[in-house]
Amino acid sequence: MHICQTKSILNKLSILGLAMTITSLLSASPEMMTLPVGVVEVPIVGEGKTAFISQGGLVAARVFEGPGAVPTTTSLTADAPDWIPGAYAGTHYVQLNGGEWSAITANSSDTLTLESDLPISPSVVFKIHPLQTVDGLFGASNTAGFTGGADLSSGDLLVLWDSSVQNYLGYLYYNSTRERWEDAANNYAGGTILYPDEGLLVIGATSASIRIKGEVQLDGTVGVLAGEGGVSIVPNPYVAPVAIKDAGFEGALSGGATFGDADWLLVWDNDLQSFSKYFYYDTDDSTWKDASNNPATEDDVIVPGSSIAVIKNSVGVATWKMSAPFTFTK
């Protein structure tokens, strides 16, 4: 029943905005860097209702930070970082300060080989993070607090959505009998990678809050939007609200003189279980408006811990770029 409900909701382009509470913001002190870390609580709606969540503006703690260069679109070099060859291949990603990122497919002592293209530059500042996994984000022993179950039908379901293929990547749940994350075929799934721009869908068995921890995302964020009417589930990648009018989507989406002429941003209401607001970029007035042509205000935000739906009616995939809505000073 849960799976059928999920398909029905996604077929209606459903997405649920969640509230997030930052319960702590601490200063950790490794040998060479000071990292802001956070703990967030995100409510899950029970009774088989569906919620989309983000990773709460948190990432796996960086393992390296420094200057470098991008001599080709698929390589990044640094000056004598003394990396262990192969240490980051398939398990880590690199992120530039502007938000551009790529998974790492190989590395030598001073060069990273990249899975996807980065902009060529003689000088960049970058970080290396572990790719987030289900075990890493939610805990190998379910420290996040999902409702577990003996099988797929008895607990909360975590569903992965891939905008590039417009389909599910799989259904996961915490098996409380074997005490591990599993997929629909009961295979171990705790190592499943959760990419930074990947939508997360939760179908709640009971109403509760999950609790996640991580390093606070401080840099810009970049992701890809599907075209030709495709649905992209775009997270708020920060621990603060992001105003619709300041989110930077006008650089990636096509605006129009009316709502019907443009690409759309859709905000979900968890109480109504339906879309409550629809936005488009009005090219005549150069501003974001809702479907009733009211200008977007400071109160129209993507709340922390949530995601929104983007429907790009125009042709071709596009890259969206969002700046952090705050400044962190070490």
Q: Which role fits each region the language model picked out?
A:
Residues 136-155, 160-165, 218-276:
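Surface-exposed interaction/gating patches
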Residues 14-24:
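Bacterial N-terminal signal peptides
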Residues 33-124, 129-133:
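Autoprocessing Asn-cyclization modules and mimics
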Residues 27-65, 211-224, 319-330:
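Boundary/junction segments of secreted and surface-exposed precursor proteins
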Residues 52-63, 68-70, 153, 161, ...:
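Long, low-hydrophobicity ectodomains and other hydrophilic envelope-associated domains
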Residues 75-117, 167-190, 274-299:
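Extended, beta-strand-rich, solvent-exposed assembly scaffolds of outer structural proteins
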Residues 2-15:
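Bacterial N-terminal signal peptides that target proteins for export
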Residues 172-216, 276-326:
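Charged, amphipathic alpha-helical scaffolding segments
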